[in-house]
């Protein structure tokens, strides 16, 4: 031992050193290599590091974990700690999520698995146990189907992003447990039909986006129970007709977009036309594609005399649902047998401002008002450092000495020159 150091450990200096050792904070898990960690709230940020797997030895106290823009291929049980509130894994190479991966993340509120182009299927129990999950992002993957109970038990879910997948069909009661869901994004898929009970259970739904699919038919009861829906997008599909009863089930509807569909303005259009005569909504144009003499006209501006040659409409009791011997064409409002199917249209992305017709009344909310808080997923997946995730939280501190360390270390600094 150096003579100077021996003198430092004797007398008053030894007491000072003891105070210093007692004031040292307990040892905590280190931050994973190439990651950045913050203490308040406990955050680990590891985005854009070309990781092929989730880093080992994540601090168990982590509440926010950002792993987006890496090369992670699979997720296994035991990888994540139970204190996680936010988990971002978008823009990776995920192809497999093993059963039980998220089972013990009972505090998790946001899970982003979007923009994983190799994620083609999910196990039925993938999200089991996530009872506090509020936001689930599965956009821009390659999902062609979803298990019937994939969302079972997600009773707190409010935002569900399923856009830009390859979904061909949605099972009845797929969303039955999502009583608190307010936003459902299904645009940019390959859906062809909306069945009778596909949206059953979504009593809190406010916004439903179905544009850019291949829809040819909507069951007359498909929207039954969506009493709070204010925004419905059905543009850029292959709809030639739409049952008026389907829209009559939407008493809170504010904004409706039906443009870029091959609308048939013959007798099949009368239920939809009749609904428009009663409804007060902000709507896009509904341009007629057939018959030739009405091509280019707006379905909403047709007159009662345009339907004089049509058979009288079948009366329907309020709240009744057609069943039994009714033809599926009538239930879905599609063309009768023998009519040529409409070609699926390409994804319609950017509507012109004049596409919406304003409601009556100067104080009515605009569509932009409703979308003010919506963060587009298209831009999010391209960010390498989204929002505050890449910055230290406002209340976090850098390498600043705690109050318990300042006095002992100051004592050592003052004594050291006299003993060395």
Curated annotation (Swiss-Prot):
GO molecular function, one term: signaling receptor activity
Residue ranges of the region described as Disordered: 286-390
Gene Ontology process terms (BP): cell surface receptor signaling pathway; corpus callosum development; negative regulation of neuron projection development
Coiled-coil ranges from the UniProt annotation: none
Processing and modification events after translation: Undergoes zinc metalloproteinase-mediated ectodomain shedding in neuroblastoma cells; is released both as a full-length ectodomain and an N-terminal fragment containing the leucine-rich repeat (LRR) region of the protein. N-glycosylated. O-glycosylated. Contains terminal sialic acid groups on its glycan chains.
SUPFAM superfamilies documented for this protein: L domain-like (SSF52058)
Ranges: LRR repeats: 61-82, 83-104, 107-129, 132-153, 156-177, 180-201, 204-225, 228-249
Domain of life of the source: Eukaryota
Residue ranges occupied by any LRRCT domain in the UniProt entry: 261-312
UniProt keyword terms in alphabetical order: Cell membrane, Cell projection, Disulfide bond, Glycoprotein, GPI-anchor, Leucine-rich repeat, Lipoprotein, Membrane, Receptor, Repeat, Signal
Residue span, LRRNT domain: 31-60
Lipid-bearing positions (GPI-anchor amidated cysteine): 390
Protein task: Cell surface receptor that plays a functionally redundant role in the inhibition of neurite outgrowth mediated by MAG. Plays a functionally redundant role in postnatal brain development. Contributes to normal axon migration across the brain midline and normal formation of the corpus callosum. Does not seem to play a significant role in regulating axon regeneration in the adult central nervous system. Protects motoneurons against apoptosis; protection against apoptosis is probably mediated by MAG.
Protein name: Reticulon-4 receptor-like 2
Organism: Rattus norvegicus (Rat)
Organism taxonomic ancestry: Eukaryota, Metazoa, Chordata, Craniata, Vertebrata
Underlying gene: Rtn4rl2
